[in-house]
Amino acid sequence: MRSTKTESLELIKALSEAKAPSGFEDASIAVAGEFAETFAAVEEDHLRNLYVTPKKSQNSDKPVFMLDAHGDEVGMMIHSITPKGTLHFLTLGRWDPNTLPASKVMVHTKFNTWIPGIIAAKPVHFMTEEEKGKPLNIADLVIDVGAVSYEDAVENFGVRIGEPAVSAVDFSYDEQHDIMFGKGFDCRIRSEEHTSELQSLV
């Protein structure tokens, strides 16, 4: 039986709010797997691919076809920590640097927690005229988590080089206009669609 609209929205919300940038897809894979294991055989390989097979199709001699979707999202990875405790980052996926300043993000830590941060750029009133006329580069941006030194960022906030970060966006649904707001819709909407389609075959 296919999921109801309410059930689909709940799954989309869970998938959208999973913090799973490219290379760190564990959370979104877990959400999809937990939903699917109620009606299907679920397997995961060493490359973190998740295979969902309706139980009644496991030993069938009928043709097999694949419904494919990916579970990651664009994100960031911390590549250095400044003496003042701010974090330089690389992008995982494509971002327009000019849209990022003042965005809230969540940064993963060595304590296996996520802490909030704000993407900051050099204030306009500190820029030279030449700087004001140039587009921003990722190298011009830092994430501020509130740390006041390198040691503070590492020891107290638990930040490490190589930790991922994602946009801090909660899922919401405008029932009146039937519109969803969130992050990671590409391609997690497809993940929901595929698992619901497979569920309907049971």
Predicted ranges, named:
Residues 1-192, 196, 200:
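N-terminal hydrophobic/helix-forming segments and targeting peptides
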